[in-house]
Amino acid sequence: MAHKKAGGSSRNGRDSNAQRLGVKAFGDQFVSAGSIIVRQRGTKMHPGENVGIGKDHTLFAKVDGKVAFSVKGALGRKLVSIIPA
């Protein structure tokens, strides 16, 4: 009658799914209007010319063109712009 009693239940064993954040279109890459350029939490990068920002801080292209990254101002803000093609 060798039986094993019930083991204790662990309170671990969960994990959340990855959020898939980051740059989706890189410098000099051609994008069409509405394309997502950057998915981010907060404004790590700011919208420049022809770039819009969604309510979750996603940056997207407003026009067709090439993606351009730049740094602006004393605070060193990263800007994402679209140069129309």
Swiss-Prot record:
Alphabetical GO biological process terms: translation
Keyword Ribonucleoprotein tagged: yes
Keywords: Ribonucleoprotein, Ribosomal protein
GO cellular component: cytosolic large ribosomal subunit
Keyword Electron transport attributed: no
InterPro entries: Ribosomal_bL27, Ribosomal_bL27_CS
Signal peptide as annotated in the record: none
Record-level Gene Ontology MF annotations: structural constituent of ribosome
Any Pfam family the entry gives: Ribosomal_L27
Disulfide bonds: none
Family of this protein: Belongs to the bacterial ribosomal protein bL27 family.
Name of this chain's protein: Large ribosomal subunit protein bL27
Organism: Methylobacillus flagellatus (strain ATCC 51484 / DSM 6875 / VKM B-1610 / KT)
Designated gene of the protein: rpmA
